[in-house]
Curated annotation (Swiss-Prot):
The gene coding this protein: grpE
Predominant location category: cytoplasm
Name the UniProt record assigns to this protein: Protein GrpE
Alphabetized NCBIfam families for the sequence: PRK14143.1 (NF010741)
Family the UniProt entry places it in: Belongs to the GrpE family.
Amino acid sequence: MNEDQVSLENQTNPVSPEASDVPAVTPEESPQPTDAVLGEPSGEQSEDPRIGAATETEGGPLEQEKSSEEIIAILQKDLASHRQELAEQSEQLDSIKKRYVALAAEFDNFRKRTQREKEEQAKLIKGRTITELLPVVDNFERARTQIKPNSDGENQIHKSYQGVYKNLVDSLKGLGVAPMRPEGKPFDPKYHEAMLREPTAEYPEDTVIEELVRGYLLDDIVLRHSMVKVAVAPEEGAEVVNGEAGANP
């Protein structure tokens, strides 16, 4: 090797002064890795306590069986609790249903009672109004029986107010008003008012012989009682002449 090549190598690989002072180490003198550094067990070494704890935690078949029994017991307890809660809620629901049915029935009765009272009140008001018109009807009836027209003019007037009377009676019928017809019927204080009593053998005792003032009904309500003459049995020893009792001579 010539000097030019050595000079070129020195320029290519310069060596620092510090590196030149470090002594070279031979392979025999380099440190070798020990077993402890490589992670291999050296001699007798104690087992890791965490591994033992994990093993104890996992347990054997007996411990697993006990754990399953505990879970089943807890689930059964929860199931019994839910069943008890369901039974209580079912009882509460039945109680609410019963109260609802009772309340619905009470409300229905209240509605019917209110409707009935309303109808009765309306009928009562209507009856009072119609009662005020009954004397007018009586006057028309008396005029019809007592007035006898003698001329064509009087007859025309008579027909005119009798036409008014007919219209009035038809209107009352349309409102549900009906006259009583008590003749020949047993006396009933609910509908009749006895004005006269006549001894007679022609009718049974307490039979209505004649209606003196006509009575009227509004459906089943008495607007005015019928004023009547009632038959009574003749006294013993009394002679009945033309339906009237008289003393024997």
